[in-house]
């Protein structure tokens, strides 16, 4: 039995992320671990503002901390009740140290991480993606399913194929981890430069492999800039599609300078993204 971990902010529980995690665990009959990142340094209130601007009393600070504990407890309880109602194999972890380090460590011992794209564990307003999301996608030791704000039943698979081994690896991991979704139609999208032909990279091998797994497949080759053409092509897609892509395992400096395809898609579409890269 494979193990899925679903990460949650107990102070701001993502209902959508919970639904995706429970649905997948139920369909695939996997063990589900709810990882509640109860980072001691993260609260629902800004201590600096309270202490230095409002002059908060110890009594008020204690009350606010207790309210946070109650929120986290209720979020965990809700997850537990949902899992019980679906008769899932599950357990719950409460990780109390630095959230990003705790989560990356959890991914070493997981087959799949399910995570809301809106998580930040920060009081500061951040441009999308948050630092928390960026570092998780870079350092995760298992594939990541990044979920949108709204839950939608998956009806179609879209695979972004750039001809590189990383993208093929992502598709292999998808087929390995989510076999119940292989009955859905898949659209393979590849974007080439204006100087190149319209042949799918390694077309014969790709089509041969796809047909071993998916019942219905379609192949689309576009020309132009990958980010631009992919976004334009996906405008017609609904939120019921799931996109598979290989995450570029670039340096952290490179990630800050140039957005990845995952960032581009998350900014423009409300679709779940299955992201995988080969760890080294």
Task: Label the predicted regions.
Residues 1-59, 139, 152-221, 240, ...:
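Small/aliphatic-rich secondary-structure junction motif
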Residues 14, 18, 92, 100-150, ...:
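Gly/Ser-rich helix-loop-strand patches that form or flank binding pockets
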Residues 56-71:
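A short acidic, glycine-rich active-site loop
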Residues 71, 75-79, 86-88:
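Ordered, amphipathic secondary-structure segments that act as subunit-interaction surfaces
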Residues 83-91, 213-218:
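A short helix-to-beta-strand connector/capping loop
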Residues 94-101, 224-228:
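Charged docking surfaces used in two-component/phosphorelay signaling
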Residues 207, 224-237:
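A short, acidic, amphipathic alpha-helical segment used as a generic capping/interface helix at domain edges
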